[in-house]
Amino acid sequence: MLDPFGKRAESLIREEFGDLLALLERVPSAISVEEPISLVSWMLESENPPQELVEVDNLEELRDLFKFYALLGAASISPYGLEAEVVKRATLRLYSERIKASKNLSETMLPVVPVGENEIPHNDLNILERRMDRNLSPEEKEKLKIKYKIPIKDLLNLWGSSLKEVYIRNGYAYLRWETALKMWEKAFEKRFERAVNILYEYRDELPEFYHRLREKLEEIAEEYFKERGEMFKGTASPLRFDLFPPCVKEALKGVPAGMRNYAITVLLTSFLSYARICPNPPKKDVRIKDCINDLKIIEEEILPVIIEAGNRCKPPLFEDQPHEIKNIWYHLGFGLTDSPTMEDSGNSTWYFPPNCDKIRANAPQLCKPDKYCRGIKNPLSYYLKRLYLEGKKKEGETSE
């Protein structure tokens, strides 16, 4: 399988399973937890994937697809955690090497087609491929050849540089092999991130298989990033208010009567607590006492923010409804109390932040999407995405 998101893969999933969720249900009965690990673990020992992973028999393509989507399902449990990042890096490199070996992009997700023999005017081709330059080696000449064309509308979604660098004719951009491959790599990263965000919404429905696989990936990821001195992402850390999603920022300003309980007790309480204490929950039904040892973080960093936001409401929530503080603790998983202890953690459910569609339905005034909201299904995913992008930005600045 050259591309797990490509045309052949999509056709296979549709014909054999109907949809992606049905495929994910089938995976645990088709492969062991250990099998997908091989697609990632090579990163601990080498810069390049071993040849036995690059050369896959066509008869094994369904099993190969099972392995990739097993990793994707496990990564979706923590879409901006270390596990997802190491899976993305490993599989991107692996499938890129397979495409290089095949010298073919036609079956990938990239909407390119080979360039016809006389499609580009002769004079233009002489300039683009430097055909008159006799100093070029055969390898250099091959690199300069125009191989593919892509519709401009598809190019714009992936191209990060000036269009002055691109030869455009009749609504198509014409690409050399290396440029086309780099665009496929960008497309793979985007599709991977979108897929784990979509699956994140269904993570509680995933079989236990994926949670066990995530634990193994976590071990590999921690070793991989520790050796390279890279930033750990998605771990408990002080709140970054500047990276909060628009709906949370709106709730922090205070809201009118009718929205107060939902905005403060339901949305803010769940979002702030998970964002600060456990942004990437390791399991279903996690409790606060599974993540911290005392109530100091809640009492000093989370509760004051919730109370301040409640006091900005009109009328002020906690002056108008003093008992609502018990509901705050209830939503944090301590039961209906106003003076909890750590032992009370687990007396009720620690509510997870509501998904975006529920926020739109219950408090549409809070929903004011920005450019980072695209593809996001939950406000916590938004925050993790912003933290992730911020970390990547700092890594880039450090390496310069």
From Swiss-Prot:
Its cofactor is [4Fe-4S] cluster. One of its GO terms (cellular component) is primosome complex. InterPro entries: DNA_primase_lsu_euk/arc, DNA_primase_lsu_PriL. Binds 1 [4Fe-4S] cluster. Coiled coil: none annotated. It comes from the Archaea. [4Fe-4S] cluster binds at C247, C356, C367, C373. Heterodimer of a small subunit (PriS) and a large subunit (PriL). This is DNA primase large subunit PriL. The keyword Zinc-finger does not apply. The keyword Metal-binding applies. Keywords: 4Fe-4S, DNA replication, Iron, Iron-sulfur, Metal-binding, Primosome. Regulatory subunit of DNA primase, an RNA polymerase that catalyzes the synthesis of short RNA molecules used as primers for DNA polymerase during DNA replication. Stabilizes and modulates the activity of the small subunit, increasing the rate of DNA synthesis, and conferring RNA synthesis capability. The DNA polymerase activity may enable DNA primase to also catalyze primer extension after primer synthesis. May also play a role in DNA repair. GO terms for biological process: DNA replication, synthesis of primer. The gene is priL.
